[in-house]
């Protein structure tokens, strides 16, 4: 599921970047192929064009993914650090800490990839 979601996100115009070592565009792709011959994990991080506000709108409109502060479960979990674990920081402080305001971390669960992508697509449409 992680690869399917990462590929969808990489092609979406409202997504600024995708961090997933399974993607050929990743600077870590060669290492992933060497050390993870059976594929990577289901954790995908990505940045939304539009910053903190776009990430907040996206998160509020997800229906399938659970909004959690952790990203390890059989179900899909999603987190925007700027609006949860790091919410006390302003954008400058987030940048200094290496946590972009637009960052979303998604741990893809066992749901069907088609259902996950449909949920992500409808949430992105709300931005």
Short names for language-model regions:
Residues 3-63, 69-74, 89-95:
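Conserved small-domain helix->loop->beta segment predominantly found in fold-type I
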Residues 60, 76-127:
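PLP-dependent enzyme catalytic core of the Aspartate aminotransferase-like
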């Amino acid at each position: 599921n992680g690869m399917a979601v990462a590929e969808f996100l990489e092609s979406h115009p409202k997504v600024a970047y995708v961090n997933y070592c399974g993607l050929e565009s990743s600077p870590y792709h060669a290492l992933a192929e060497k050390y993870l011959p059976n594929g990577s994990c289901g954790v995908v991080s990505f940045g939304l064009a539009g910053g903190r506000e776009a990430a907040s709108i996206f998160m509020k409109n997800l229906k399938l993914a659970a909004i959690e502060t952790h990203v390890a479960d059989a179900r899909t979990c999603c987190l925007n650090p700027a609006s949860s674990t790091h919410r006390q920081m302003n954008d400058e402080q987030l940048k200094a800490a290496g946590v972009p305001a637009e960052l979303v971390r998604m741990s893809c669960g066992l749901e069907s990839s088609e259902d996950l992508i449909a949920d992500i697509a409808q949430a992105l449409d709300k931005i």
